[in-house]
Each structure stands twice: as C-alpha cells, then as structure tokens.
Amino acid sequence: MYKNIKKFKLESFIAQEIGNLIVSGGIKDPRIHSFLTVVKVEFSKDLINAKVFMGSIKEGASLDNAVKALNNAKGFIQSQIIKRIKVRSTPKLLFVKDDSLSKSFYVNKLIEGLNTTREN
C-alpha cells in the first residue's frame, strides 16, 4: 500500500515538474512549445523507469518532433527534477506520444457540429 501511495505521489510530482519546465521555457529547444501537456506518467514497479505520455492542446502542433526533443533533453530534465525531489535514484524518463487529447478535441468538434445542425 505504501509503495502505491509513493508511486502515485512521484508520478504526480514528475508530471507537474515537467509541465512547469515546459511552460516556463526552461528547456531551450524550439521544437518544445508551451502547448505541450503531460497526459500521464507511469512508473515501473521498481520506480526506476518512468514513461511520460505527452499530448498537445494545439491542433497541428508537431507532437512527434516535440517528443523527440524531450527525449534528447531528458538528461537535463532529470537533473532539474533531482534538484527538487529527495529520492535515492532519479527515474529514467522516456517520453512517449499520446494522441488522446487530439482525438478528444476531434470528438468534441463532431459533437459541436451535431449540436449546430440540430439548432438550425
């Protein structure tokens, strides 16, 4: 039970810190834009590896390039996280593209289109 609580807190903290780094412009790469968002973070059972699922709230934004840039900058990101958290070892980050946000925007547009046709 304690490990599950610790895992959940770490996942939340990592997501928040990565989001803060992106929004504040702490990562100096033009491929990383402020429309990126951390969808979720999943740790392995041993808390050594973490998958960070990234999405974009802007349509047409190049999520593939942004994920590549984040994977290139993961050493820097890990070093920034370790400054703010007290753990024995820094989790190894792997950034992964998550299309769920863009799919949900698409579904919302479809629903809005249906509502517009019903009103007319």
From Swiss-Prot:
<dbReference type="GO" id="GO:0030490">
    <property type="term" value="P:maturation of SSU-rRNA"/>
</dbReference>
<keyword id="KW-0690">Ribosome biogenesis</keyword>
<dbReference type="InterPro" id="IPR000238">
    <property type="entry name" value="RbfA"/>
</dbReference>
<dbReference type="GO" id="GO:0043024">
    <property type="term" value="F:ribosomal small subunit binding"/>
</dbReference>
<comment type="similarity">
    <text>Belongs to the RbfA family.</text>
</comment>
<keyword id="KW-0963">Cytoplasm</keyword>
<dbReference type="InterPro" id="IPR020053">
    <property type="entry name" value="Ribosome-bd_factorA_CS"/>
</dbReference>
<comment type="function">
    <text>One of several proteins that assist in the late maturation steps of the functional core of the 30S ribosomal subunit. Associates with free 30S ribosomal subunits (but not with 30S subunits that are part of 70S ribosomes or polysomes). Required for efficient processing of 16S rRNA. May interact with the 5'-terminal helix region of 16S rRNA.</text>
</comment>
<protein>
    <recommendedName>
        <fullName>Ribosome-binding factor A</fullName>
    </recommendedName>
</protein>
<dbReference type="InterPro" id="IPR023799">
    <property type="entry name" value="RbfA_dom_sf"/>
</dbReference>
<dbReference type="GO" id="GO:0005829">
    <property type="term" value="C:cytosol"/>
</dbReference>
<dbReference type="InterPro" id="IPR015946">
    <property type="entry name" value="KH_dom-like_a/b"/>
</dbReference>
<dbReference type="Pfam" id="PF02033">
    <property type="entry name" value="RBFA"/>
</dbReference>
<comment type="subunit">
    <text>Monomer. Binds 30S ribosomal subunits, but not 50S ribosomal subunits or 70S ribosomes.</text>
</comment>
